[in-house]
Amino acid sequence: MRVLVTGATGFIGSHVIRELLKRNHQVIATSLDKEGLERFDWYDKVEYVPYNIGPATEENLYTLFKEPELLIHLSWAGIPHFKDLIHLKNVGDNFAFINNLLQNGLKDVTVVGTCLEYGMQEGCLKEDMETRPTTPYGLGKDCLRRFLEQTKKE
């Protein structure tokens, strides 16, 4: 399977890529930090496509990223500054990015959320719990999830 991984140089992204390669998937990695990407032992086993997730573009991102079958979306600007208002801007940018891929042929998407979508709670969290974000980061991730769920229904 051809898998596009955003946020490839992040902690989660680097481990996801390693596991995908172990399972013999073709990986397309994107990140703004090519030098950071080159430090991983798997760098020469992936296709690197530099891209900055920003405002909506008319460019066909599905073609740019060589027609992936699955997107694993891990990229998110502004971490670890959880109270920064950039997280509210991220909602539109990330939705436009994912929607462009879907509109142009992508069939399968996995987006990583955050425990902060549930607010400041103690104990185990479950997916069926009500979300109550209290930070711009949690709110941004929760809004993106809701927009994507609505898009799926349409």
Where are the language model's segments positioned?
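Active-site Tyr-X1-5-Lys
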Residues: 134-154
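Structural motif
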Residues: 2, 69-70, 108
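Conserved glycine-rich Rossmann-like NAD(P)H-binding loop of the short-chain dehydrogenase/reductase
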Residues: 25-34
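N-terminal Rossmann NAD(P)H-binding glycine-rich loop of SDR-like oxidoreductase domains
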Residues: 3-23
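Catalytic Tyr-X3-Lys loop
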Residues: 81-95, 99, 133, 139
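Conserved Rossmann-fold NAD(P)-dependent oxidoreductase catalytic core, especially the SDR/UDP-sugar
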Residues: 73, 95-135
